[in-house]
Amino acid sequence: MNKILNFKKKLQNNNNNTNNNNNNNNPKASILKNNNNDNTNDNLKSKIVVKSTPVIQKSSSFANVPNSINVNTSSSGNKNGDKPILLQSMFNKGKRSNEITNRKIPPPFSEDSFYKSGVTSKVSTTTTTTSSTSKPILPQTITKPNKTNETIVPIPPIKKPISNNNINYNNINIQQSSSTCTISNRVRDNLFLLKEESKSEYNIRVNEIEKKVISNNNIDYNDPYTQTIQKIIMVEKEMIDTFSAMIEFQPLQNLAQTQILKSSSRLSSNNNNNNNNNNNNNNNNSNLLFFFDDQNN
């Protein structure tokens, strides 16, 4: 029995020794161990560091100053007195009078001084001091270096073409100039043949439509389909006349292009209106654009 009790005491002593060693190596355990002793160990006090965040407090001594704050970085307060930071001075627009030195005022720009060489431009410089009155310095004279080999190329005036004769087309007087009509005879002949072929083909198609559709006694002129065909024929005649004028007289090219665009837009609008009015009509009126095929055989 005594042997058992002695063995139990040895076990307890060993456990106490191991716990003490672990506690000595662990700083947290040492802090907890000395909590009851009111932290009498100076080394433990030096190890425990409490970081304080900056506290922004309203300054009491600068209560009447707007936008003033007191930045206190210590946990126990500022013992040396309040040192307020004026926000108004931190965010001031511009500079203070004692920070401005040798402010230069450039002269107004002038074309004569820019193009002419050896022109002296005056730059007035003023300095301000901390006193209430500022004394301006006399203007300094700066001489620009002479520019060598400076040439100014003049812009030639725009010359209007000389008009030889006036061409009256659709009650519009258009001047034909000799400088713009530079088409060779061979190209002009080819364009003339193209115009004649297009005219002849166009006339054949128009005659066929007039015979089969418009000249029919039983036709209803109030029918949207018939009205569309009549408008197409009228617009196509205008386009052929404009095309021939564009070939014969080159100054009419811009006018001809504008006229063709207007005519084509009229054709497309008429075709859309006809399709909207004839929903049950199976004929596709878009085939009538520039191709006068008879669809009412």
From Swiss-Prot:
Residues 65-79, 140-151 have a biased composition (Polar residues). This is Putative uncharacterized protein DDB_G0291005. Residues 122-135, 268-287 have a biased composition (Low complexity). Residues 12-43, 65-85, 122-151, 265-297 are annotated as: Disordered.
